[in-house]
Design a protein with these regions (language model features):
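Conserved ABC ATPase "signature" region
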Residues: 30-48
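Hydrophobic anchor residue at the start of the ABC signature
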Residues: 67
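Conserved ABC ATPase signature
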Residues: 53-57, 61
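H-loop/switch region of ABC-family ATPase nucleotide-binding domains
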Residues: 114-115
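Conserved catalytic motifs of ABC-family nucleotide-binding domains
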Residues: 74
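Catalytic Walker B motif of ABC-type/P-loop ATPase nucleotide-binding domains
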Residues: 78-81
Length: 199
């Protein structure tokens, strides 16, 4: 899925666009229809949009249509370039949770290209940081985000919550140094303040 979905959409209707891949895979009409419905639902596309021209859609809807077109083929390897760019926070979360679910259910490899360290911290278990066309860092979240100086040297940073927790540690709060998500920070901080992290 490309960063600019308008370069990926081309057919007369959103439905035809999503069906393009499965049709070229030689699938039957019933299977194509089922995959179109499934992929549209996965991407959060309302069924009322399926018979519209993809060029009438908003930017976020185009992104969802482009993702649906790829998902309809049920790929074993899925490469997405900034899949949540232009989506509101709920849309971002829906797309990334859907990708995580797809990966878990299908066993597919999902590769996401993104500048959002927050998204990468929440949804990726292995990271490769590119700089000038080469791999600059790679490893687990701990291995990559533990090198904040190296990340900053190329214009990236650790997630905001990681920086916040580092400041809290400097102030004396006994927090682990591997907090990369708001959820992990909440779970670590609330008990220290007498709250219940599970509430």
């Amino acid at each position: 899925v490309m960063q600019y979905p308008e370069y990926q959409l081309f057919d007369e209707t959103v439905r035809a666009d999503i069906a393009y891949g499965p049709r070229n895979m030689g699938l039957g009409a019933a299977e194509i229809d089922a995959r179109v419905a499934e992929a549209a639902s996965f991407a959060g596309l309302d069924a009322s949009l399926l018979d519209k021209s993809p060029f009438e859609l908003s930017g976020g809807q185009k992104r969802r249509a482009a993702i649906a077109g790829v998902m309809a083929m049920r790929p074993e390897i899925l490469v997405l370039d900034e899949p949540a760019a232009g989506l509101d926070p709920r849309g971002r979360e829906d797309i990334f949770k859907g990708l995580a679910r797809y990966r878990a259910e299908s066993g597919a490899t999902v590769i996401v290209v993104s500048h959002s360290m927050e998204d990468m911290a929440r949804y990726c278990d292995y990271l490769a940081v590119m700089n000038d066309g080469e791999i600059f860092l790679r490893g687990t979240q701990r291995e990559v985000f533990g090198k904040s100086d190296a990340l900053q040297s190329i214009g990236l940073d650790v997630p905001d919550v990681t920086r916040l927790c580092a400041l809290l540690r400097e102030g004396g709060m006994p927090l682990p140094d591997d907090i990369y998500t708001v959820e992990a920070a909440t779970a670590a901080i609330l008990p220290l303040l007498g709250g219940d992290a599970d509430a």
